[in-house]
From Swiss-Prot:
It comes from Trichlorobacter lovleyi (strain ATCC BAA-1151 / DSM 17278 / SZ) (Geobacter lovleyi). CDD domains: EF-G, EFG_III, EFG_mtEFG1_IV, EFG_mtEFG_C, EFG_mtEFG_II. Residues 8-283 form the tr-type G domain. This is Elongation factor G. Keywords: Cytoplasm, Elongation factor, GTP-binding, Nucleotide-binding, Protein biosynthesis. GTP binds at residues 17-24, 81-85, 135-138. It is found in: Cytoplasm. PROSITE patterns: G_TR_1 (PS00301), G_TR_2 (PS51722). GO terms for molecular function: GTP binding; GTPase activity; translation elongation factor activity.
Length: 692
C-alpha cells in the first residue's frame, strides 16, 4: 500500500495559546469545516471534540494534547491541541518537539497574554515557524492593530499582517486579503460555511494599500530578486508574493498575522488556507539529527526510503484499546504487526495496531510513513521521548527535556482495598506524564507524589478517582528536613548488663565532629591502637552509629555530614558481643550529638523568575518576605530574570501567588540547590510541631 498524500502536502501543526484565547474552539471549527465533525462542539457547553477528558469538559481547559488528522485543499493536516495552563507546560513542550509549525491564537481584546509569552519562548527554543491568528474579533474592545503591536513589543517577533478586519466588535463581518487585494465577507445564516468575495470597501482601500506595501517591502527585504523588481516599480505576481511569504515564515523571519472569530465562524477557512500555503511540510524543515550506536551524529531525512525512525511523544490510557503511544514518524515506513527497536531503552517492541486519531474517534491503519503522526497500540516499554527505529540501523533522536517536579504531597488510600489499586494507578499516570513522580518515603512508609504545581497534583488525584476509581486522602505539602552538628566532642558509650549467666559488655570512646564541607555525608574512622577493642567488633560499632543517624536528636530527622572516630574502649573476654558494641556505638553517638550543638537543615531551592519589567518590585519584595536571597538579575527577551535562593518551606502556594501578583505574566522554575541551617526561631517552631 503506498502513501495516500505526498509528503509536501503534509502539515504537522500545533495550536498554542493563552488559557482563554479560544484555542479549542478554533480547533473545533477547523474540524467542522474540514468535514470531520458534523456538529460544532462548543467549549462552554462542555461538548468540544478535542476536550475529551471529563475534567477538561468540567473545567473548560485543555489538559491533554489530543492529536487529530483532517484534510483541506488536498493537504493532510495533523493538529495537536495544547494546554495553556502554566502547570501543563510539559504538554506544550512535548508537542512542540514533534511539530513542524504552529498556529498561535491570540485574543483580540487581551492581546499577548502571559501564557502566550511562555509558550512563545518554548516555540523559540525548538525553532518552530508560526502563524498568528487574532481571534475573537467580534468581542467588545477588539483591536487587531493593538494585537499586532503587542506581538512585536512583548514577544520580540516580527508580525506581518496578511489580512485586515472588515468592521469590528458586533460589526465584524469579514476580512481584506492583502495578497489578493479582495474583501471576503461571511453571511450569518450558514454558520460561516458561505462567504463571497467583493471589492475592498472604499473606506478601507487606502489602509489596505498601505499595509500591502508594508507586506511586500518586508518580504522583498529577504529576497534580492524580488527587491530588484519591487524597487524597479514592477508589480509582483500573486505566486511570487506567496512563495516569498512562505520562505520567510519557514525561516522565522516573519510571523504572518490573520484574524477572525472562531466562535462566530468567521475567518477559519482563511486560517486553514494560510496553514496550507505558508506552514512548512516535513520536507521544508532541517532533517532530524540523532546519534548512532558508535556515538556519531547522523541525520534522518523525511523520506520513505530512509531507515525507519520515530519519536514517542505522548502516552495515553484509552478505555477501549489500553495504552496508546503517540508517535511522530521522521523517516521510513512502519507496518502494524511489525517489530521495532526502542533505542533509548535497548528493547525490542511489537507494534500491535496503528491508529489514526480524530479527536476521540479512531481509525485503524495498516502503515505509517515519514511525516505521519499516529498512535501505536501494544508498546510495553516505550515512554515519552523514546526513539523507535530499525534494530540494524539504530539511532537515538534528541529527546524531550523534562523539568524536575517541585512540589510533593503524601497520599494514602481511603480503604485497605484501594492500597493495591493506588500503586497501579500511580504507576500508570507516571508513565503517561514524565513530569509526575511517585516514591515511597523510607522513614514514614508513606507514598509521596511530586509534580509541577498544585493544580497538576490536584488533577492527578482527580484522575485516579475517575479513571481508576481509587479514593485517596491527600496530605499537606511536605519539606524534607535534615539534622547535623556544629562542634567537635569526645564521648563515651558504655553498655553493660549483668543478670546471671552470660552478661553483655560493650565500651567505646568516640570523637564526633561536623564534616569540613557540607554534602560529604557520614564517615567512620577506626583509630584503635593495641587491640583495646577487638577487630571483629569494630564493624558493629560502625553499624550501630549508622543506624542512629536515621533518627536525629532534635526532631528525628536523618543526621548528615558527621565524622565519627573510634579512639578507645575496652572489652570483656566472655561478655562482649557484636550486639553489645553495636548498642554502645549507638548510645555514644546519640550523646555526642546532644553535646555537639545539633542544628536543623532545610532544603534551599534555586528559584528563577522571569517577569516583565513593571512587576519586578512586587516579585523581589515577595521573594524577600519568603526568606529568599536575591542572587542576581538579568534581562532576557523583553523580560527580567530574577535569580534567588529560597527555602522550600516558604515556596508552597507560590505559583498561585506569583500568578496573581503579576496577572499571570511571570513564570518561574525551581530546582533543589543545597541544604542550609534553619534560623533558630524557625527551627524551634518546627521541633515543637514534630514533638507535638
Amino acid at each position: 500500500m503506498s502513501r495516500l498524500s505526498p509528503l509536501d502536502k503534509y502539515r504537522n501543526i500545533g495550536i498554542m495559546a493563552h488559557i482563554d484565547a479560544g484555542k479549542t474552539t478554533t480547533t473545533e471549527r477547523i474540524l467542522y469545516y474540514t468535514g470531520v465533525s458534523h456538529k460544532i462542539g462548543e467549549v462552554h457547553e462542555g461538548t468540544a471534540t478535542m476536550d475529551w477528558m471529563e475534567q477538561e469538559q468540567e473545567r473548560g481547559i485543555t489538559i491533554t494534547s489530543a492529536a487529530t488528522t483532517c484534510e483541506w485543499n488536498d493537504h493532510r493536516i495533523n493538529i495537536i491541541d495544547t494546554p495553556g495552563h502554566v502547570d501543563f507546560t510539559i504538554e506544550v513542550e512535548r508537542s512542540l518537539r514533534v511539530l513542524d509549525g504552529a498556529v498561535a491564537v491570540f485574543c483580540s481584546v487581551g492581546g499577548v497574554e502571559p501564557q502566550s509569552e511562555t509558550v512563545w519562548r518554548q516555540a523559540d527554543k525548538y525553532r518552530v515557524p508560526r502563524i498568528a491568528f487574532i481571534n475573537k474579533m467580534d468581542r467588545i474592545g477588539a483591536d487587531f492593530f493593538r494585537g499586532v503591536q503587542m506581538i512585536k513589543d512583548r514577544l520580540k517577533a516580527n508580525p506581518v499582517p496578511l489580512q485586515l478586519p472588515v468592521g469590528k466588535e458586533d460589526y465584524f463581518k469579514g476580512i481584506v486579503d492583502l495578497v489578493r487585494m479582495k474583501a471576503i465577507i461571511w453571511d450569518e445564516e450558514s454558520l460561516g460555511a458561505k462567504f463571497h468575495e467583493e471589492e475592498i470597501p472604499a473606506d478601507l482601500l487606502d489602509e489596505a494599500k498601505e499595509w500591502r506595501d508594508k507586506l511586500i517591502e518586508e518580504i522583498s527585504s529577504h529576497d534580492d530578486a524580488l527587491m530588484e523588481k519591487y524597487l524597479g516599480g514592477e508589480e509582483l505576481t500573486e505566486a511570487e508574493i506567496m512563495a516569498a511569504i512562505r520562505s520567510c515564515t519557514i525561516n522565522i523571519q516573519i510571523i504572518p498575522v490573520v484574524c477572525g472569530s472562531s466562535f462566530k465562524n468567521k475567518g477559519v477557512q482563511n486560517l486553514l488556507d494560510a496553514v496550507v500555503d505558508y506552514m512548512p511540510s516535513p520536507l521544508d524543515i532541517p532533517a532530524i539529527k540523532g546519534i548512532d550506536e558508535s556515538g556519531a551524529e547522523v541525520e534522518r531525512k523525511a523520506d520513505d526510503t530512509e531507515p525507519f525512525s520515530a519519536l514517542g511523544f505522548k502516552i495515553m490510557t484509552d478505555p477501549f484499546v489500553g495504552q496508546l503511544t503517540f508517535i511522530r514518524v521522521y523517516s521510513g515506513v512502519l507496518q502494524s504487526g511489525s517489530y521495532v527497536y526502542n533505542a533509548t531503552k535497548g528493547k525490542r517492541e511489537r507494534i500491535g495496531r496503528l491508529l489514526k486519531m480524530h479527536a476521540n474517534k479512531r481509525e485503524e491503519i495498516k502503515e505509517v510513513y515519514a511525516g505521519d503522526i499516529a498512535a501505536a497500540v501494544g508498546l510495553k516499554y516505550t515512554t515519552t521521548g523514546d526513539t523507535l527505529c530499525n534494530e540494524d540501523q539504530a539511532v537515538i533522536l534528541e529527546s524531550i527535556e523534562f523539568p524536575e517536579p517541585v512540589i510533593s504531597i503524601a497520599i494514602e488510600p481511603k480503604t485497605k482495598s484501594d492500597q493495591e489499586k493506588l500503586g497501579l494507578s500511580l504507576q500508570k499516570l507516571a508513565s503517561e506524564d514524565p513530569s509526575f513522580r511517585v516514591k515511597t518515603d523510607e522513614e514514614t512508609g508513606q507514598t509521596i507524589i511530586s509534580g509541577m504545581g498544585e493544580l497538576h497534583l490536584e488533577i492527578i488525584v482527580d484522575r485516579m478517582m475517575r479513571e481508576f476509581k481509587v479514593e485517596a486522602n491527600v496530605g499537606k505539602p511536605q519539606v524534607a528536613y535534615r539534622e547535623t552538628i556544629t562542634k567537635k566532642v569526645k564521648v563515651e558509650g558504655k553498655f553493660v548488663r549483668q543478670s546471671g549467666g552470660r552478661g553483655q559488655y560493650g565500651h567505646v570512646w568516640l570523637e564526633v565532629e561536623p564534616q569540613p564541607e557540607p554534602g560529604k555525608g557520614y564517615e567512620f574512622v577506626d583509630a584503635i591502637k593495641g587491640g583495646v577493642v577487638p577487630r571483629e567488633y569494630i564493624p558493629a560499632v560502625d553499624k550501630g552509629i549508622q543506624e542512629a543517624t536515621d533518627n536525629g536528636v532534635l526532631a528525628g530527622f536523618p543526621v548528615v555530614d558527621v565524622k565519627v572516630t573510634l579512639i578507645d574502649g575496652s572489652y570483656h573476654e566472655v561478655d562482649s558481643s557484636e550486639m553489645a558494641f553495636k548498642i554502645a556505638g549507638s548510645m555514644g553517638f546519640k550523646e555526642g550529638c546532644q553535646k555537639a550543638g545539633p542544628i536543623l537543615l532545610e532544603p534551599i531551592m534555586s528559584v528563577e523568575v522571569v517577569v516583565p519589567e513593571e512587576y519586578m518590585g512586587e516579585v523581589i519584595g515577595d521573594l524577600n518576605s519568603r526568606r529568599g536571597r536575591i542572587m542576581g538579575m538579568d534581562s532576557r527577551a523583553g523580560a527580567q530574570v530574577v535569580s534567588s535562593m529560597v527555602p522550600l518551606a516558604n515556596m508552597f502556594g507560590y505559583s498561585t501567588d506569583l500568578r496573581s501578583a503579576t496577572q499571570g505574566r511571570a513564570t518561574y522554575a525551581m530546582t533543589f540547590d543545597h541544604y542550609e541551617p534553619v534560623p533558630k526561631s524557625v527551627s524551634d517552631e518546627i521541633i515543637a510541631k514534630v514533638k507535638g
